[in-house]
From Swiss-Prot:
Reaction catalysed by this enzyme: (R)-mevalonate + 2 NADP(+) + CoA = (3S)-3-hydroxy-3-methylglutaryl-CoA + 2 NADPH + 2 H(+)
Protein's UniProt name: 3-hydroxy-3-methylglutaryl-coenzyme A reductase
Alphabetized UniProt keyword annotations: Isoprene biosynthesis, NADP, Oxidoreductase
GN (gene name): hmgA
Role description: Converts HMG-CoA to mevalonate.
Record-linked SUPFAM superfamilies: NAD-binding domain of HMG-CoA reductase (SSF55035), Substrate-binding domain of HMG-CoA reductase (SSF56542)
Family: Belongs to the HMG-CoA reductase family.
PROSITE patterns according to UniProt: HMG_COA_REDUCTASE_1, HMG_COA_REDUCTASE_2, HMG_COA_REDUCTASE_4
Activity-pH behavior: Optimum pH is 5.5.
Active site (UniProt): 99, 305, 400
E.C. designation(s): 1.1.1.34
Temperature notes for this entry: Optimum temperature is 85 degrees Celsius. Stable at 90 degrees Celsius.
GO BP: coenzyme A metabolic process; isoprenoid biosynthetic process; sterol biosynthetic process
A single GO molecular function term of this UniProt record: hydroxymethylglutaryl-CoA reductase (NADPH) activity
Length: 409
């Protein structure tokens, strides 16, 4: 069938958008859907149709009912000096955003930390989680169920690990509420973010549990104790994805000459804004100035699951005055990133990861994803430092007026 024939059928409602993939090659199907939509809504979509993506490469992998692609400006910051266990050296970091002044802000923070010797970064924990919820008729059955899980842990581990070459079950943590039990499974997932990997593994385990402990009714493979795409205490306390810490000691001359401030003032603002202000506002774990800005921009650029910004931007900014220098650290308990799979395979996202030398599987497995996590945490620290400094000297509004609105200031 020709494209124009498919377009006509779409406009008449004789076929649905998803059925086009059965009639045309993937790229032709994308064109047909877009042309039909243009006729249906009466709007031309030439920009959406202009893309470098080969849709035959992402069919049944990244999106459905595709009509084109959205483009977001991509900027670069750096070089930032990172002294991590996996990221060692100077790195340029790609950031995709439509927020004027963000990239310039982060870049000034990077200049300050690099002139002060760079950022030290460490991945303290690395595990992706999934937590199915089991329903019981009575709490009488729960102690035996927990004992069953403990006694069959190795068998469960073998079942889970058999579903993937890279997924390795590390632990199972039970949580009980009434006649409900959540089992929070934690996995190593190599260089993948690992959400699909652990879901497939846990589904197999749940089949085994229901077959061998019939009173356990697995209602859902995800019971929200995982906790995916939500700001939760369980992620802040136990971690999800990478738990990363980064620190730097900013020299007094750098604070004065680059940031136009002083250590005591930046520290005071951090305590009153990021800690007292956040506590008074009632946030669970967002004790920071703008982690979300930096993490989101890097997530978009590198093909991460952007919805996971909810938990990936949770974290804490800590400062101390040391003489006239400023100690600053950031802690991200649930940074969920990968360098293989998902959106990382898209051509522009692949190139963005390659800028930092982290595309694909690392050697050993998992090292590239941890390297990326250390780079992100170091960039987040730089963004926090600069924003706190900008607040201390009343530069925030001027920066956004100049770079966000193109106003003369």
């Amino acid at each position: 069938m020709k494209i124009d024939e498919v377009v006509e059928k779409l406009v008449k409602g004789e076929i649905s958008f998803h059925e086009v993939d059965n009639l045309l090659e993937a790229n032709a199907a994308m064109v047909a859907r877009r042309l039909a939509l243009e006729k249906i809504v009466g709007v031309g979509l030439p920009s959406i149709g202009s893309t470098v993506i080969d849709y035959s490469e992402i069919k049944n992998k990244n999106a459905e009912n595709v009509i084109g692609a959205i483009q977001i400006p991509l900027g670069i910051v750096g070089p930032i000096r990172v002294n991590g266990d996996y990221a060692k050296g100077d790195f340029y970091v790609p950031m995709a955003t439509t927020e004027g002044a963000l990239i310039a802000s982060v870049n000034r923070g990077i200049k300050a930390v690099t002139l002060s010797g760079g950022v030290r970064a460490k991945v303290l924990k690395d595990e992706m989680t999934r937590a199915p919820v089991f329903k019981f008729d009575s709490i009488e059955q729960i102690p035996n169920f927990l004992k069953f899980i403990e006694e069959n842990l190795e068998k469960i581990r073998n079942i889970a690990n058999s579903t993937s070459h890279h997924g390795k079950l590390k632990s199972i943590t039970p949580f009980v509420l009434g006649n409900n039990v959540w089992l929070r499974f934690s996995f190593e997932t190599g260089d993948a973010m690992g959400m699909n990997m652990v879901t497939i593994a846990v589904e197999k385990v749940c089949e085994f549990i229901e077959e061998n402990f019939p009173s356990a009714d697995c209602l859902a493979v995800s019971g929200n104790m995982c906790s995916d795409k939500k700001q939760t205490n369980v992620n802040s306390l136990f971690g999800r994805g990478k738990t990363v810490v980064a620190e730097a000691l900013i020299k007094k001359d750098v604070i004065r000459n680059i940031l136009h401030s002083n250590a005591q003032l930046i520290h005071d603002i951090n305590l009153r804004k990021n800690w007292l202000g956040t506590a008074r506002a009632g946030s669970l774990s967002q004790f920071n100035a703008h982690f979300a800005n930096i993490v989101t921009a890097i997530f978009i650029a590198t093909g991460q699951d952007v919805a996971q910004i909810v938990e990936s931007s949770s974290g804490y900014t800590w400062t101390e005055v040391r003489g006239e220098d400023l100690y600053i650290s950031v802690t991200l308990p649930s940074l969920e990133v990968g360098t293989v799979g998902g959106g990382t395979r898209l051509p522009t996202q692949k190139e963005a990861l390659s800028i930092m030398g982290v595309y694909g599987s690392g050697n050993p497995p998992g090292s590239n994803a941890k390297k990326l996590a250390e780079i992100i945490a170091s960039t987040v620290l730089s963004g926090e430092l600069n924003l706190l400094a900008a607040l201390s000297n009343k530069e925030l509004g001027k920066a956004h007026a100049k770079l966000g609105r193109a106003m003369k200031v």
